[in-house]
Structures are given as structure tokens and as C-alpha cells.
Amino acid sequence: MATIHWSKRQVAGWLAVALSTAVASFWAFWGINENFHEGWFHESLLLNVGLMFLQYLSPMIIFLSLALLAIGFPRIGGMAHALAGISLAWVLFDWEDRVAMQLVILPMLGLGALYWYGRPQPRRRARWIAVGLPMLTLVAAGVEPAVRVAGRVHDNNLDARVVDGNGIRLVWAAEGMGWPHTGVTWHEAVRRCQHLSDDGRSLAETPQNVWRLPTVEEAVRSMSRHRINSGGVWDAQTSVARYQIRPDKEPPLWNVHSQVIYWWTATERNDDAAYMVVYDGKVWPRRKRIAPDYLAYRCVKPADAAR
């Protein structure tokens, strides 16, 4: 059996291809999962596809493009990697930030140097690997969330809803001040629920104390999928929620076409943090002062109060 002898330049070239492929595959996995987790909420298919490519798949596309350029034109591709690393560090970090130097600039300079010196042979095989593995990762990781999102039900009912099941019966506020489309801090969410009018349409100048934030247990027990209660149970000792059926971003609790995927709950972890619930049922502690657009709230009141 003939022994294959690789030159140093071949080893360097294939090492560069392997690193590029690994990074692109990681971004393919992350991007397609995040796309269907927090993205894909527009009513327009064009907007959903555009957001997917521009925001979630762009890191994979960048690394794929750089790898293909470097395989075909090693020195141009090597310089492109260096410029990309410097540009990303400049855009994403403070120029004097050591994290930027260690996690972005130096790795990209190193990868660029490997492509500059290396010569992966045969190039055609290198191209197929650099493109094929990330695309395979993209498809394999994207099938389940794509099918799940495509199968979501939506009844276009954004009014106040009585949700009864799993030992919990509550009225969940209608779209508006009691159920907004943008995020607020935990303290602001608590304040708004306290000031929300009885009909849930406006905020009063003084606390009405009709509405409130749901507790973690109430939110977990109310979760559903395809209008079937998910059988959620909240273990306060381990801070873990368990379900018989995995919940999803569907009515009566969630708005399919809203960017909001997390809700504040009334349950505090400590003075600085409170628990939030995700549409898929997970529960995480977050600092009360943060207010990203995708973290909002939905006020609740006892169902008996609606009579």
C-alpha cells in the first residue's frame, strides 16, 4: 500500500480548510436554530427569509465565502481573512478590548496565515468539504424547527383570554398595555400591571391592583401546544420546568407574529434578578434592569374577577 506524503503546505492548507469548515458549521447550526427560535415572526415570507439570511445565516455565509476565496486564491483569501477579523473587531468591540484581540483578530490572522502559506490539494475536494459540511449541518439542524414553526396554529385572537387547565384558571390581558410588543424592565412590567385598568386597555395614574404578573408556576402550568395543555410542572427546588408536551409559540398565550419570545414573571430569584419564561417552556433568571425588545410581559388576573 502506497504511503501518502503530504508537504507542509498541504498540511497547513487542509488545517485551514478544517478550521473554516468547523467555524462555518457552528454558525450554520447556531444560525438556523436561532432563526426559528427568535426569528421567523413576520407575516411576510419575504421579510422572514430576508431576516434569516441577513441576521442569522450571515456569519456562516461570510466564513463560507472567505474559505472559497482562499482555496482558489490563497494570498488574496489570506489577506481577506485578516481584513475581516480587523473589521469585525472594530464593529463589534472597542478597539482596545483584549477580548476582541484574543477571540477575533488573532484567530482570523492565524487562519489567514494558514491560507496564505497552505495549499490544500486537491482544491476541488477542499471546496466540496468547505461548502458541503456546513450546508449538511444547516439542513440537519433546521428540519425539526422548520416543521414545528410551519405547523403552528394561529387564531388571530389577541383579546383577553381565559386559560383554564392544569389547576390554573386566569385571565390573560389583551394586546396593548397589558401585553405589549416591545420589552421593558421587570420593575416597569410590575408597575404597568399594577396600574392597568380593569378592562386591560389603559394605564391609570394610581395603582388599580387588578392585574399582576403571573408567577413562574402559573406560567408553566398554563403553557400549551396546539391548544392542548402541556402538563407543565415547576420544581422550585431545582428551578426546572418539566412538561408532558413541549410548549410552543401559539395562542392562547403567545402571539405568533410578535418578536416577543420571553415574558417576565412575578417570581424573584433575588433582589437583582427575576425569572422569565420562554415560549417553549424553559425558565431562566435574568437581571431585572434589562429590557431587550424580545423580553416583555403579559398581565393576569383571577378568572373570577372577569365575571
Where are these regions (language model features)?
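Hydrophobic cores of alpha-helical transmembrane segments in multi-pass inner/ER membrane proteins
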Residues: 59-68, 103-116
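Central hydrophobic cores of alpha-helical transmembrane segments
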Residues: 74-88, 130-133
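An exposed tryptophan-centered "aromatic clamp" motif
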Residues: 194, 198-208, 216-276
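Cytosolic-side transmembrane helix boundary signature
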Residues: 107-133
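Extracellular adhesion/carbohydrate-recognition regions
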Residues: 148-211, 296
